[in-house]
Amino acid sequence: DSKVLPALGRFKHEAVAEDFLHKHLYLTEDTPDGGFYRFIPDGLTKDGKINFSSGKLQIAVLNGDSQEGKVEWKNIKDPNPPIWQILLKINELRYQVKDSAKFNGGEGIAYYEGKIYFATKGDNKIWCYDTKIQNIIVLYDHSTHPNPILSGVDNIVFSSSGDLFVAEDGGNMQIVAIDSGGSLVPILQIMGQDESEITGPAFDPSNERLYFSSQRGKSGSASGGVTYEVKGPFIKI
């Protein structure tokens, strides 16, 4: 059953990932000047899971105009303002903290070995936030990379071997992996579906099958979506 979670904030939610070690949530915002958010629950459920009913919603702050470096987290005072305020662009969460860092169209997000990775579609970047040292860097930048084959960055997922698979929304309709050394490896490309986007990449528990969807398929319409299975195994690339 669906359930509203007011403590997680009222904003243009895109994706969420759990820091399994600290039991924190990290959230992206799909807007050109979006925030990067963290939710710290007040406690856990009896079975050790995150209690979504209450906690602190925070937004990332960086020093000056820098988009890399040490992150400071500041509390959102009013995480769930009335909907009319949001519609009138009054009291939007990312503006409640004046110096919050701005990210150009937050998209997919994933956790791996103490780090949070997320994509921003407006500038075709992949970011990496280290939860231990609370520092953020740009892992991939289409505008400066010597081999910029990855564009339209969107949904992301990690293989069990630690390679980051990035799905393209448009671009060349590819899934491209970023290995631990930062090299780009094209995994697959869908042809003849230029009006679509690749969504929801996920691995089965054995890491031998990759699943993903083409949101609008060949027809380009919402009813034309197709889901694919790719057999591996997906060992270290």
Where are these regions (language model features)?
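Sequence/structural signature of beta-propeller domains
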Residues: 1-237
